[in-house]
Structures are given as structure tokens and as C-alpha cells.
């Protein structure tokens, strides 16, 4: 007898991150979900910071002090990395949805990871002025 779907639960959420039984497509799915969650968190944080900037010149000056810190720059690099990975993985999903490269999902995924690493390195080197 087949098990009935009982609705969402925390246990079902954590199944996303269980490495057992995942093939390349499963890892691509997990990467897409994690980057989407990270970008959503960043958007919320960004809106809070914009609200602080609305407090006038003192809020803006304190923001600039924070924005020039290496930790903040590293956080920006993480956002850029998530955006690049999410965007390229989205292109892979669109291609496979339309039947392009369905039999070559592994190559597409590792290709997008390679392109992502190169682009993220270029952004990182420019952001940290290296």
C-alpha cells in the first residue's frame, strides 16, 4: 500500500539536504533552493538596511563605515555568488524543460559550476582589489 501525503513537516524539509540517493540533478535542485533561500534572506536584510538609511545623514555615515569593512565585502561576494549560481542553474532548468540537454544533465551542471567559479573569482578579485 502506498503511503499517503500528510502535508508539510520539518522532516520532509530536511530530506532536501540528505545526500543519500541524490544524483547530479538532485544536487542541482538543492543548490537552486539554497541559493534562492539565501537571496530571499539578503533581500529582506537589504530592505532593513535601506530603512536605516532613511534616518538621515547619520544613518548613511554609519552605513558607509559598515559597507567598507572586509566582512561586508565578503558578504556581498556571497550574494553575487548565489545570484550567479542561481541564475545559471535556472538557465539549465529552462534548457532541460524544453528538452535541450536532458540526457546531459551532469555535463550541464558541472559546466555551469565551472563557469560560475570563473565568474565568481573575477568578481571577487575586483571586489577585493586584488
List the model feature ranges, each with a label.
Residues 1-130:
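Membrane-embedded alpha-helical bundles that constitute the cytochrome b-like, heme-associated redox core
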Amino acid at each position: 500500500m502506498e503511503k499517503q501525503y500528510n502535508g508539510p513537516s520539518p522532516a520532509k524539509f530536511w530530506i532536501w539536504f540528505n545526500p543519500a540517493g541524490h544524483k547530479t540533478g538532485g544536487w542541482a535542485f538543492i543548490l537552486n533552493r539554497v541559493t534562492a533561500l539565501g537571496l530571499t534572506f539578503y533581500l529582506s536584510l537589504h530592505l532593513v538596511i535601506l530603512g536605516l538609511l532613511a534616518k538621515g545623514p547619520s544613518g548613511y555615515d554609519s552605513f558607509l563605515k559598515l559597507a567598507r569593512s572586509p566582512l561586508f565585502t565578503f558578504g556581498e561576494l556571497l550574494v553575487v555568488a548565489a545570484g550567479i549560481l542561481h541564475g545559471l542553474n535556472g538557465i539549465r532548468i529552462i534548457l532541460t524543460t524544453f528538452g535541450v540537454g536532458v540526457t546531459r544533465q551532469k555535463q550541464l551542471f558541472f559546466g555551469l559550476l565551472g563557469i560560475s567559479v570563473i565568474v565568481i573569482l573575477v568578481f571577487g578579485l575586483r571586489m577585493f582589489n586584488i
